[in-house]
Amino acid sequence: VAAAQALREIERLACWSVKQANLTTSLLGDLLDDVTSIRHAVLQNRAAIDFLLLAHGHGCEDIAGMCCFNLSDHSESIQKKFQLMKEHVNKIGVDSDPIGSWLRGLFGGIGEWAVHLLKGLLLGLVVILLLVVCLPCLLQFVSSSIRKMIDNSLGYREERKKFQEAYKQPERVV
């Protein structure tokens, strides 16, 4: 019962984490789009300022801090990380056949028919082992129970005979 509850809790947490990862990815994607549009607007404004300065005969040297302008772009690495995050989210799931997965991992790329065959053989082996372990105990229990029933039955018959003999009235001759 505790294992089933723990499994349900793990499934619930996995579902919750997938939903949170999807929401986070969506939110960060929207923020990246906003940053990209803001970056584009800043670059357009900088180009307009440079154009106006040049139109009035001034260069960037005339105003302190206007010559150096660094606006880094990390959108490509962020997109790669989004893709990686989505791949990890897609890997989250419930394994409905843990024994089959274990066998596939153990024996490599075996076919489904081989997995079913190995699962059947494994089940048969477990049943045989259980019989080998439990059968002697079960036979001893049944044997002792039958012996007790027979002893009780024989003891009851002997007691009955003794009782009848003890209370047997002599026959009257008429």
Curated annotation (Swiss-Prot):
Keywords: Cleavage on pair of basic residues, Coiled coil, Disulfide bond, Fusion of virus membrane with host cell membrane, Fusion of virus membrane with host membrane, Glycoprotein, Host cell membrane, Host membrane, Host-virus interaction, Lipoprotein, Membrane, Palmitate, Transmembrane, Transmembrane helix, Viral attachment to host cell, Viral envelope protein, Viral penetration into host cytoplasm, Virion, Virus entry into host cell. A lipid is attached at residues 134, 137 (S-palmitoyl cysteine). Disulfide bonds join 60-67. Residues 143-174 are cytoplasmic. This is Envelope glycoprotein. GO terms for biological process: fusion of virus membrane with host plasma membrane; symbiont entry into host cell; virion attachment to host cell. The chain crosses the membrane at residues 122-142. The gene is env. Residues 1-121 are extracellular. One of its GO terms (cellular component) is host cell plasma membrane. Residues 4-54, 72-102 form a coiled coil. Signal peptide: none annotated. InterPro entries: TLV/ENV_coat_polyprotein. It holds the Pfam family TLV_coat.
